[in-house]
Amino acid sequence: MRTKRTRGTRNVGASMPAGAANADSEDWKEYVSEDIIAQLNKHQLPYSEILDEKIADLANHWHFQYVMAWLSNVCESYTTTTFNTDQYGGSSTKCLWKNIKFDEGVFVTDVFSKIDGKDSNYYNDEVDVDEGSQNLYDRIRLQLLHQLAGNKSGQLKDWNVIVNHHLQNSSAYSDLVTDLPFLELEIARQFDIIYSIIKLIEMKNMIFKNYLANNLHLFTFSEVILDDDNSGGEEMKSLFALPNVGVLVKKTIHRVKEGSSSQVSQTLNIPIKLQNCTIKESDPDIPDSVELIHLEYSHDIDAYLQSITIDYDVITTNWGSMLEYWSENKSSKAIDEFITNLIPVYAEHRLYSAKLLANREKERAIAELMTRRKRSSRLVAKEEENKKKDLESEWFEKLDEREQFIRHRNKLVSKEIKKIKDLLWNQLWQLYDQDYRDEKLTRRNELKDRSGSGTPFFETSLGREEDNPLNEIDIGVLDHGPNFQSSIIPVEPPIPGTVGPLQTGDVPELPSDFCITKEELDELANYGIFTPQQEPDNQDSVFQCPGEPELAPMIITEDTETDLFNNRPLICCDHCYRWQHWECQPPKIIELISSTTKSPQHTLSQRDFGVIIMGNSHGNRRSSRRPQSTLEPSTKSSRPTDKRKPLSECSTFICAWCIRDLELELRNIFVPELKIIRAKQRKQQEDRERRKKMKEEKKRLEELAKKRELTESVSPPVFNNAFANMSSSTTPSIAAYEKTNPAINPAPNVNAAHPIITYSQQTGSKTVPQAPQAPQTSQASIQPQQQQQQQQQQQPLHPKEQNFHFQFPPTN
């Protein structure tokens, strides 16, 4: 047994079916270990003879074998998992398509199961096929589509569109363009198209180019040069082995025979360095001149390449044909050594495929057995109970999501309405204040003209009723104020109407995912699950536009042939759920809604709201460069609500009619609010006037008290001995003058007799006042003087009008 391992001698293998090789080819066992032989006898390839018959013609096709080898190198397969890369650097191979586990036997089985109609999705590429599909043929086609298009959004139903687009742009494969469904083509033509797709990926896809540069050893096949007579070197033949089990391909390179009339040489000599492609020449007429001449070799290279043609001929297609070819060419030392190195590799590869197919067949048999077996009533009841629990859980989860969506939408609408109300309320007060100032100024001018004086006009001078706090100016502005009476949102009211039995206010406008359908209610009733929702949701959409108020509400349907809302931007009011034309919205509405955003200086546009376009809007649109974008998948639901943006991605929209209703609501409460404000202002004014009067009265009393104190302080002292004839009841006692400043002597009054206190200064003694000798005055003259003093005390003068006279003692 040979122990040499090369590119073809990978230490893995596959099983060999009984009768795959005749008795003359039993010599291969000498090159395989006994362990592998024992496992090959234990594991047999299922349907090996049937598959060999089906692919007999297809296996001789070079494109088919190339596709098999290419898929083995890019998917997780025997080649990528067991190939030893130590000699090329690294210890493992990272597959390009890690999510696909490829084997030739499994792939061919799935291909013919798809074509023979055993697959339930036969000829049905409209069914969405994902990476978890069981059919390997579908998964590989989907992966090729993603690699060709350069993104992962393509689907198998877009196969013809994307593939034909790339084939038309390629001159080498433009003849493969077809309008027939891919699965309806012949199996050989299908692999021709797949081969062309692989070639386009190799030329254009950068991801594959990087993978090829890092794993070049996978695409370097074992090859041996054949020593056949090539008639003077015009042909060169070689034999190389593909990763496919037992596939040997002969490569023949033909060259054009060099003749007298042919300008093509069998050898191509071109310089490697750029400096050898440039010639320097100097002009003898011009001194010190240098001219650079670049030699052109492109024509020679193109001619040489056109003189060479390469043909690929599949010599063996499976394990048995390879052993037969080996037995026939044992006389050739090169072929014998080449094949003997491949025998252990292919044997282990067949064992790998046999185990993989056996496990897959076992899983399929178990699945069919579980499906067809007779189940007990207890298990059936348990499954029904589990299904009921799952259905009930899904139902209540849907109700929770539905309720959460409604609450979230109502919250957004409530916030928007509150902001709009605040703006409308401020604008109403601004309009009212403007009219109030104008009316007040007008009345003031009229009063000036009537009175002919410059007396200012006071609001409080107008007569007002006690039960009505509004003044005449308020009443005049409320009745005929030009600015206040004009509507902020000028829009005509809608025509009240119904759409059959449906009221426009009863449309919930919920997305289809949150709508309750009759089928769901029937299914819940079958399982006996109680639900508070007894009626399905109405999924109709109502159209009524303020630009056409004469039209009654109508139902929007996808098949309605009308230009009223087809191919026109539509927007739905989030408050009344009526669909309207976007272009019919008053600019005042957009300006008002823009003022409620975080950046009021930015005016909202159509793309900021959930605007949709009904009907086919692709006729006037430019096509995208990406082929999968030219035919966008149609929306499953034709409801306008399902086409709009989610609530979190667009601004809340309130229509003109709803804002007009908000304005009317605010106008209804404006007069009561104004009365409250005026009553409060009147009360505040009365309080200010009362406080002012109290302050003035307090000040007057304080001044009166000060004058009384001053009057009492300047009254003369009365002594009983000096004025014996005066009444004691009207004369203050001497005790009242104990604290009087003795340095001050009031001036004598000619109208009354006042005592003058004299001072005598003695050294070392205190100053003691001495009463002078008062003249004798009659009782009749004293009484009028006392009455006059009492009258003066009863009518005190202003402090500024009183004159006090003090007589100071002379200074010695």
From Swiss-Prot:
Where would one find coiled-coil regions in this protein?
Answer: 673-714
Region named Disordered: 1-21, 614-646, 679-704, 762-812
Q: Does the keyword Thylakoid apply?
A: no
Q: Name one GO biological process term.
A: chromatin remodeling
> Which SUPFAM superfamilies does this chain map to?
FYVE/PHD zinc finger
Start-end of Low complexity biased regions = 769-796
* Superkingdom assignment: Eukaryota
Q: Does the keyword Protease apply?
A: no
Specify where it is mainly localized. Answer: nucleus
Keywords for this protein = Coiled coil, Nucleus, Transcription, Transcription regulation
* Location relative to the cell: Nucleus
Listed Basic and acidic residues bias regions: 683-704
Offer a single GO CC term for the protein.
Answer: Isw1 complex
Q: What does this protein do?
A: Functions as a component of the ISW1B complex, which acts in remodeling the chromatin by catalyzing an ATP-dependent alteration in the structure of nucleosomal DNA. The ISW1B complex acts within coding regions to control the amount of RNA polymerase II released into productive elongation and to coordinate elongation with termination and pre-mRNA processing.
Query: How does it associate, per the subunit comment?
Result: Component of the ISW1B complex, which at least consists of ISW1, IOC2 and IOC4.
Protein name according to UniProt: ISWI one complex protein 2
This chain's source organism reads Saccharomyces cerevisiae (strain ATCC 204508 / S288c) (Baker's yeast)
Originating gene: IOC2
